[in-house]
From Swiss-Prot:
Organism: Bdellovibrio bacteriovorus (strain ATCC 15356 / DSM 50701 / NCIMB 9529 / HD100)
Function: Cell wall formation.
GO BP of this protein: cell division; cell wall organization; peptidoglycan biosynthetic process; regulation of cell shape
Protein name per the record: UDP-N-acetylmuramate--L-alanine ligase
One term of GO molecular function: ATP binding
Entry-linked PANTHER family: UDP-N-ACETYLMURAMATE--L-ALANINE LIGASE, UDP-N-ACETYLMURAMATE--L-ALANINE LIGASE-RELATED
Listed transmembrane segments: none
Compartments in which it is found: Cytoplasm
Residues annotated as binding ATP: G112, T113, H114, G115, K116, T117, T118
Gene: murC
The organism's place on the tree of life at top rank: Bacteria
Taxonomic placement: Bacteria, Pseudomonadati, Bdellovibrionota, Bdellovibrionia, Bdellovibrionales
EC number assigned by the record: 6.3.2.8
């Protein structure tokens, strides 16, 4: 059965990764339906495109589907999952559906604990600049295409590869990018060693004629891939890398190391509108993918110059009364440090007020020590209750306790009640930069603050 003739039903279609895939299959010509507990902007967009979306989960929603696609957020006892099992309808994770689309194209898969969405969107910007009409699947709304997905007529597919449940092993890309490997999603992997092995095994899926692109700044990551049996390219700020990036404040240069001759030469220069060393690294990874696909460096640089960002990544929401409001998805200590350093780079003299909502009890517990020192670039930190993401509370793991152990002099526990917006408005003054951080629903508070300024 060809994809365009199949009937797909998505369980959890409102999720940021699921909605893009549903849109892509709909545009290919497949019959697509979906369901979610709550309606949101993603489900509304799908409805506008003509996709049938059910609010809530019920066995009848499955209908005459040929295959049921589920997200990692869906619980085992979901009635639609049970219905598919009872009727022996194939059940596949999101990554397997993406893998089926990737089989029709030349795939570029962007993996890594941090920076996947940004790197995927930067890579997409480069391929768009080169007029290659790529198919795109991103875990965030990409400003250049005003969506999370786009069906292109070209031969390349640029996709974000989510490692959180290990299902990215379903993908077989021609080019794989690994931005970094950090200790996260231990609710699935159990140990950091399992996380490392998962990325190693993902990279093994690349064919002999493909390329694995890895940030080599982390010695542990270099160790994992040092004698890797595929064509590999290390990039980063460290002089040991094959491609070395230098520069700061939005202007960067890339040099190529010739290990055999012991020489180094300039490959090219590029400019970025988005601040931060982490974004410079993301950009170099995207350049590597572009050049590997035959795109000239100059075209890659032009694509990056056009890059305006992606939703929920250093996202400027607006300014009123001299107060700027931003939102960022960062929810791991490594991400928090990187994004706050980027804010400090962009606003060296302004007061930075950060509202942070931890995401998952398990992550908060595992990263507890790192969280206590992750906010040093902020001037004031407001720590609200943990967003559970379906997890049960863990005794002793609370935001109130974490706030009391923070090394930051001006960190405090903040109750998000019906007076929260007014309390924050009372703290802010002209010239401040207010940032909502986290993978939960804290961004809504930022909009409320902006609307009431």
């Amino acid at each position: 059965m060809k994809l365009q003739h199949a009937k797909f039903h998505f369980v959890g279609v409102g999720g940021i990764g699921m909605c893009g895939l549903a849109e892509l299959l709909h545009n290919i010509g497949a019959k697509v339906s979906g369901s979610d507990q709550a309606e949101n902007a993603n489900t509304e967009r799908l409805k506008e495109l003509g996709v049938k979306v059910f609010k809530g989960h019920a066995s009848s929603n499955v209908g005459d589907a040929d295959v049921v696609v589920y997200s990692s957020a869906i619980q085992y006892g979901n009635p639609e999952i049970s219905e598919a099992r009872a009727r022996q309808i194939p059940l596949i994770p999101r990554a397997e559906a993406l893998a089926e689309i990737m089989r029709l194209k030349r795939g570029i898969a962007v993996a890594g604990t941090h920076g996947k969405t940004t790197t995927t969107s930067m890579t997409s910007a480069i391929f768009l600049e080169a007029n290659l009409s790529p198919t795109i699947v991103i875990g965030g709304r990409f400003e250049l295409i005003k969506s999370t997905a786009m069906l292109g007529s070209g031969e390349w597919l640029v996709a974000e590869a989510d490692e959180s449940d290990g299902s990215f092993h379903k993908l077989s890309p021609e080019i794989a990018i690994i931005t970094n490997i950090d200790s996260d999603h231990l609710e699935h992997f159990k140990t950091f060693e399992n996380v490392q092995k998962s990325f190693h095994d993902f990279a093994l899926k690349v064919p002999f004629y493909g390329k694995v692109i890895v940030c080599g700044d982390d010695p542990l990551v270099r160790q994992i891939f040092e004698n890797f049996p595929k064509r590999i390219l290390f990039y980063g700020f460290d002089e040991k890398n094959d491609l070395v990036v230098t520069g700061e404040h939005g202007h960067y240069a890339v040099h190529r190391n010739d290990r055999l001759l012991g020489t180094k030469h300039l490959v090219g220069e590029f400019d970025l509108k988005v601040p931060g060393r982490h974004n410079a690294l993301n950009a170099v990874a995207a350049i590597c993918a572009g050049v590997a696909a035959g795109i000239p460096f100059a075209t890659c640089a032009k694509g990056l110059q056009r890059y305006e960002g992606v939703d929920r990544r250093f996202h400027f929401k607006g300014e009123k009364k001299g107060i700027k409001v931003y939102d960022d998805y960062g929810h791991h200590p490594t991400e928090v440090r990187a994004v706050l350093q980027a804010f400090r780079e962009k606003y060296p003299k302004q007061r930075l007020v950060v509202f942070f909502q931890p995401h998952r009890y398990s992550r908060t517990q595992h990263c507890w020590h790192d969280f206590t020192t992750a906010f040093m670039e902020a001037d004031q930190v407001l720590l609200t209750d943990i967003y559970p993401a379906g997890e049960a509370p863990i005794p002793g793991v609370t935001s109130e306790k974490l706030a009391s152990e923070m090394k930051h002099e001006h960190a405090q526990y903040f109750v998000r009640d019906d007076k929260a917006t007014q309390k924050i408005l009372g703290m802010l003054k002209e010239g401040d930069v207010f940032v909502t951080l986290g993978a939960g629903d804290g961004w809504k508070l930022g909009l409320e603050v902006l609307n009431q300024l």
